[in-house]
Regions:
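Anionic, Ser/Thr-rich low-complexity intrinsically disordered regions
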Residues: 1-146
């Protein structure tokens, strides 16, 4: 049981590291896009979701679509399971179309000086051993120790 818990904890940490990498890449996309543009007018309406974050959501949807499509063809699955996944696949493809359209519209608005976005730093805490209570040791006086 203890080995299983340790393995589970290692998996969680690996997932956290990959999520941090995804967040870092989304920020880099936004930074590179902003660097490719002339300065954006601060008086323009601000779009709260950045292109990088939309692209990140599209990548997650792509994975869901891939794996859901596999489930529609899995011969060892029940007919009901395959049907449920066909229905899910329709929804996921619809969501991908909506999101891709929103990204295209946002980018067109940015390029036409109708909207702007800012680089938002995610500042995730879960991988920082000085900020995540699971990763730091709490002393008897409850002060976190890095």
């Amino acid at each position: 049981m203890q080995r299983l818990e340790k393995s589970k904890d290692n998996c969680k940490r690996a997932i956290d590291k990959l999520n941090q990498l995804r967040n870092d890449l989304a920020e880099r996309v936004d930074r590179d896009l902003l660097d490719s543009l002339p300065p954006l007018d601060p008086a323009l309406p601000l779009h709260s979701e950045t292109p990088g974050l939309i692209i990140d959501r599209l990548s997650i949807l792509a994975l869901k679509i891939f794996h859901t499509a596999e489930e529609t063809r899995r011969s060892s699955a029940t007919h009901e399971h395959r049907e449920r996944n066909r229905e899910r696949l329709v929804i996921l493809n619809d969501q991908r179309g909506d999101l891709a359209g929103c990204l295209a519209e946002l980018w067109a608005d940015i390029r036409a000086n109708r909207r702007r976005f800012k680089l938002y730093r995610q500042l995730k805490m879960y991988n920082d051993p000085t900020l995540n209570p699971v990763l730091y040791t709490v002393s008897s006086d409850s002060d976190p120790k890095p």
